[in-house]
Amino acid sequence: MAVDDYEELLKYYELHETVGTGGFAKVKLASHLITGEKVAIKIMDKESLGDDLPRVKTEIDAMKNLSHQHVCRLYHVIETPKKIFMVLEYCPGGELFDYIIAKDRLTEEEARVFFRQIVSAVAYIHSQGYAHRDLKPENLLIDEDQNLKLIDFGLCAKPKGGLDYHLMTCCGSPAYAAPELIQGKAYIGSEADIWSMGVLMYALMCGYLPFDDDNVMVLYKKIMRGKYEIPKWLSPGSVLLLSQMMQVDPKKRITVKHLLNHPWLMHGYSCPVEWQSKYPLGYIDEDCVTELSVFYKYSRTSTTRLISEWSYDHITASYLLLHSKKSHGKAVRLKHPLAVGDQAVTSFKELRPKSKLDFEEPNGEIAYVFGSMDFSDEELFSEDFTYSSFEPHTPKEYVKGRLEFNSVDSAPATPVVQRNARHKNEDKENSNTAVARDENVFLHPAPWTPTPRRKQNEKKGILTTPNKNTQTKEKNQSKETPTKKPIGTGEEFANVISPERRCRSVELDLNQAHIDSAQKKKGAKVFGSLERGLDKMITMLTPSKRKGYTREGPRKLRAHYNVTTTNIVNPEQLLNQIVRVLPSKNVDYVQKGYTLKCKTQSDFGKVTMQFELEVCQLSKSEVVGIRRQRLKGDAWVYKRLVEDILSSCKV
């Protein structure tokens, strides 16, 4: 880790453990120093990105202009010569995919709750002129209140002529791709999203995909036929809705507008799906402004002006995280400057809107498009809308791989599948969303002021659903357990925290790069020295000690849907069984305590899957469990593999 690359980031955040990895990025859990709020930081290496750099630009531009209760919030963007950091809303519930496989499948009632939120998010982004183009359970996260947040806008499109403008680039995940995409035809982005939503809803209620095959070309043929299996547990209403979304002819597909108050989505509800944003960026909360101005000793007028520039720097992040605290019923308070060092305070006044990120800009000046769909001016549900139906049938299987290939003006009838087909200057489908800071671009409806609410812990209970004969697996919920040190609470931050302790979590002593020790009080220096010596002593004596571990056994965790319970009472016995099984499944692993860091590789040595299996003790019981976390690789392949491993362990 180069000091220069992380110097700016460490002024404002304390890094914790890695919670996800990808082809060119990793995601770390972190704490915002002055609010104490948890965030997720997506760390991307520019050199590794290569020709995918425009995709990052697309994602950042989209997230800067999307603010919705079911869209993951962007807080802060930091660029260095080698790195790009995206500071995002942290969703401790993990991926919706993991939730599905842990429960085998969802009941119709639970699927309806989630699907209404998905429709809300998609209707909103369509109203802002965007098509997502990569809708799938892995791109929906669950927050602390069991609400969904849509993520990963790297493949989204904002057509220059609005959503009725035809697109040509075929992208996304093969199993969720609409027939017109894989045929290489020009398509409407919003129509393709509807098909993906149908596949997603099917996965919610069935626990597997409607179209799947290990051979991608066979998979395409199944998709183009549009025939899939109808399990006996699906109700007539859900079967009808699935058929309306997964119509091979995009013109016969139901629209988002008609989904908003579709009978299936309205069942048990008195109002249509609310798609409008409750958090328009044009609204600035006075309580948050007051706290920021007092904390930084800056005038309210100047503070308001800096916030309203929406530069997605530390000012934006501090305001949005403070506002998030308020909306969750927490005190609108920032931590004392001594607890976070003077750098954050002095930097606030010095921060000004910076130049755009160093991305290649599209040619020409394109008008910025807002609200290409106006749902409120028309009847939400047309009486003359005719629902077409058919009898789909396809056996259950699993998917693998991700589709992303680009076509130019004339697309071939049979597309050539490529893993990373990139064109350096290609972003022809998106309008120029780079926003000049002196322009009034945030034209929003009247703001909705969130009323403070307490965390609704009762909503976190997992509904019971009939399960198959194998216990299913899923990704990390243990994101709340830092690898290097526990995440500080508000009370912990009230004390003076030396920069040495704060930087320990990123494995290097980076504090000298960004802490001016001359600004520290003498007492702070003394305590910092004592703490530094104490840290060294603890590290020498217990180099692998982690929060929750004891010499006697594994960590104690709360029962969660990413923890599989077992009938084995001896944790060492369970760990040994897993270790014996892994080689037979061609899984390499490294053992650290009761955690097994696993990976699979292709014949050419490329890592295709990374995940963790941890033997743990469930709190308030003597039951031993296995925590599962997918870090990298295809979700459905991961599902099969971990099911196979645990089945062989006979747990």
UniProtKB/Swiss-Prot annotation:
Record field: compositional bias (Basic and acidic residues): 423-441, 471-483
Recorded domain comment: The KA1 domain mediates binding to phospholipids and targeting to membranes.
Domain KA1 stretches: 602-651
Name of the molecule in the record: Maternal embryonic leucine zipper kinase
GO cellular component: cell cortex; cytoplasm; plasma membrane
Gene name of the record: melk
Residue sites binding ATP per the record: V19, G20, T21, G22, G23, F24, A25, K26, V27, K42
Span list, region Disordered: 410-490
Compartment(s) of residence: Cell membrane
CDD domains for this protein: MELK_C, STKc_MELK, UBA_MELK
